[in-house]
Amino acid sequence: MIKTKHHLLIILLILISACGYEPLNKGFPESNIKIFKKTFSGDNQINRKIFNKINLRETKDELGYELKLNSNKIIDQVAKDKSGNVTKYKTTITIVVELIENQKTVKSKSFSKNFNYSNLSNKFELKKYQEDIETNLINSIAREIKIFLN
């Protein structure tokens, strides 16, 4: 009876450990998409960060794709107090991705993320916080673009 319980426990542990769990990002193969031309419009700093994060291979021959990135960043004042001072902001980043082959759009999609946050009394800290928010939004959008292109 005790040996049966031990055998059952061992089999159960083997099955659980071999269930095939792996992180979502681990399963992404390296992208086979080769880019021979990239065109950026809008906020070039955001476009460069996105392009670097999606890890596409660049090639010299025209056998690859053309990638167009159009980005836009908006910082809105969402709320003000009675004296007219801003109390809340919203940062929105929108990126339109186009993958073109032989002057025909193969894939196209718009990605948008936003984040609401309170104003800080120290403007230096506020600027730094806004940069951190921008980086986080860019990372999130880059993950979505990578999934879209694969």
Regions found by a protein language model. Give the residues of each.
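Bacterial N-terminal signal peptides that target proteins for export
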Residues: 1-8
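C-terminal motif of bacterial Sec signal peptides marking the signal peptidase cleavage site
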Residues: 15-18
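Bacterial signal peptide processing site
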Residues: 20-22
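Post-signal peptide N-terminal segment of mature Sec-exported envelope proteins
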Residues: 29-49
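Surface-exposed short loop/turn segments
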Residues: 51-52, 62-108, 112-131, 139, ...
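Sec-exported extracytoplasmic/periplasmic mature domains
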Residues: 55, 59, 142, 146-150
